[in-house]
Structure formats: structure tokens, C-alpha cells
A protein has these predicted regions:
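A general structural signal for well-ordered alpha-helical segments in protein cores
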Residues: 4, 25-29, 55
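Short catalytic helix/loop segments, enriched in acidic residues and glycine
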Residues: 19-36
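Conserved strand-loop elements at the edges of beta-sheets that form or border functional pockets
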Residues: 6, 22, 74
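Residues that cap or flank secondary-structure elements
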Residues: 20, 49-50, 129
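Glycine/threonine-rich flexible loop motifs
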Residues: 127-134
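Positively charged, low-complexity intrinsically disordered leader regions
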Residues: 1-19
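Short amphipathic alpha-helical segment that frequently serves as the phosphate-/nucleotide-binding helix
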Residues: 22-26, 59-60, 134
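Conserved N-terminal subdomain of the carbohydrate kinase-like
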Residues: 12-14, 40-125
């Protein structure tokens, strides 16, 4: 069975008064899972969200799409990640909120075991900027 793992940030883009679920690893996980499940495969996200409304929204969205949420840690102290998107006529920029849950993804034996079963692993770049997640 083909199994992919997407490790890294889960966040909400705050744009024009709306919150849009994203983060490159999660976007990959959702799209790849939809494609792979047709062939008996899956893509599993590994990340960390806050114990807050946005974190609950992430878990509900994964559940509604039949994506495994077993490797999503819930941080009791830090919020779910956000990125404020500022748009202009010609461009847009992102302000990534710091000290959020995904930046403190903790090592777990379950995730290590999962990685041993994976056909491929994708790492998000934002999640690699914190030494806590290395």
C-alpha cells in the first residue's frame, strides 16, 4: 500500500476577514489522500495544533475528509498557527505568527513507527525553522 506522510505546519491564512485552512504539508496531505485512497493508499499529516477553536476546526475537517488525525498533537499552551495575508494590486505578503503549536511538534514513538512504514515523507519548510521540532 502506498502511504505518504506530510510533516509540518498546519495554519489558517487570515485573508480579507476569512480564515482559510492551509499550510503546505496539510494541503499536500488533503490532496494526496483524496487521490491515493482510490488505490488503497493514504497520506497522513503529522503536526500540532492548539487546544482552541481553530485546532478543533482542523480535527473536524480531517475527520470529515476521512484523513487520519491520529498524529495531530494538541498543544495545551500554544495556539493553532495563523498567517496574515496582505494583498496589494501587484502582490501579496505573509506574516507568519510565531510561537504557535506547529513550531513545537514533539517527537513521538508512534510517529517514528509510522515513518518506518511510509513510501515517502514530505517536510514543510516552516516547521523546520524551530529547533524544538528538529
Amino acid at each position: 500500500m502506498l502511504q505518504l506522510i506530510a510533516i509540518g505546519e498546519i495554519l489558517f491564512d487570515q485573508i480579507d476577514g476569512k480564515s482559510i485552512l492551509g499550510g503546505a504539508p496539510l494541503n499536500l496531505a488533503l490532496t494526496a489522500h483524496q487521490l491515493l485512497q482510490r488505490f488503497g493508499g493514504s497520506c497522513i499529516p503529522v503536526s500540532r495544533v492548539g487546544n482552541d477553536d481553530l485546532g478543533n476546526t482542523v480535527l473536524q475537517e480531517l475527520n470529515s475528509r476521512n484523513v487520519c488525525a491520529d498524529y495531530i498533537q494538541v498543544d495545551p499552551d500554544r495556539p493553532t498557527g495563523t498567517a496574515v495575508v496582505t494583498r496589494t494590486e501587484m502582490d501579496h505578503s505573509f506574516t507568519i505568527t510565531e510561537h504557535v503549536a506547529w513550531g513545537f511538534l514533539a517527537e513521538s514513538q508512534a510517529a517514528i513507527d509510522l515513518e518506518g512504514e511510509a513510501s515517502a515523507i514530505c517536510f514543510g519548510t516552516l516547521g523546520q525553522r524551530s529547533s524544538a521540532s528538529h
